[in-house]
Amino acid sequence: MMFATTDLCDANEERLAAGTLRVIEPVFRSFGGVRRFAGPAATLKLFEDNTLVRAALEQDGAGRVLVVDGGGSLRCALVGGNLGKLAEKNGWVGIVVNGCVRDSAELAECRAGVLALAAHPRKSDKRGAGVSDVPVDVRGTRIAPGDWIYADADGILVSDAALLA
């Protein structure tokens, strides 16, 4: 799917004004091998525990984007190279992590987009804590399951509806 977030913003000023199209705060870095991706969101809310991330990525992604609200923690990684490969294998087009990733070199080889706040060498806990398929707040932007995510080098957009046919 070819698009530019800049063009989507320009063509949808009324949606931006109404809040049905939102721009996530520009603090994310690209770690994946794909720089531009779009798809409906699947959401997770958790903190320093990536058990649910693996469980989600083991499912058929069907062209979706996994949005992981890790509370913005910079103390451990929620996604690494193995999970990046799993995302690619199972048809996820991208992962947005409000937190950290690790295995940056491996993630860069994955054919999936991966956006996160930073890299961190420490792995997360494995307690199974967190919830899935709930609205999350990522850097002040609300994202509900099924919202559309559009990401490229200029930013991340969240839309209540698909913007492209």
Swiss-Prot record:
It catalyses: 4-hydroxy-4-methyl-2-oxoglutarate = 2 pyruvate; oxaloacetate + H(+) = pyruvate + CO2. Its cofactor is a divalent metal cation. CDD domains: RraA_family (cd16841). GO terms for molecular function: 4-hydroxy-4-methyl-2-oxoglutarate aldolase activity; metal ion binding; oxaloacetate decarboxylase activity; ribonuclease inhibitor activity. A divalent metal cation binds at D103. Gene3D superfamilies: Ribonuclease E inhibitor RraA/RraA-like. Signal peptide: none annotated. GO terms for biological process: regulation of RNA metabolic process. It holds the Pfam family RraA-like. Substrate binds at G80, G81, N82, L83, R102. Keywords: Lyase, Metal-binding. Its EC number is 4.1.3.17, 4.1.1.112. It comes from the Bacteria. Divalent metal cation. Homotrimer. Catalyzes the aldol cleavage of 4-hydroxy-4-methyl-2-oxoglutarate (HMG) into 2 molecules of pyruvate. Also contains a secondary oxaloacetate (OAA) decarboxylase activity due to the common pyruvate enolate transition state formed following C-C bond cleavage in the retro-aldol and decarboxylation reactions. Belongs to the class II aldolase/RraA-like family. This is Putative 4-hydroxy-4-methyl-2-oxoglutarate aldolase. It comes from Burkholderia thailandensis (strain ATCC 700388 / DSM 13276 / CCUG 48851 / CIP 106301 / E264).
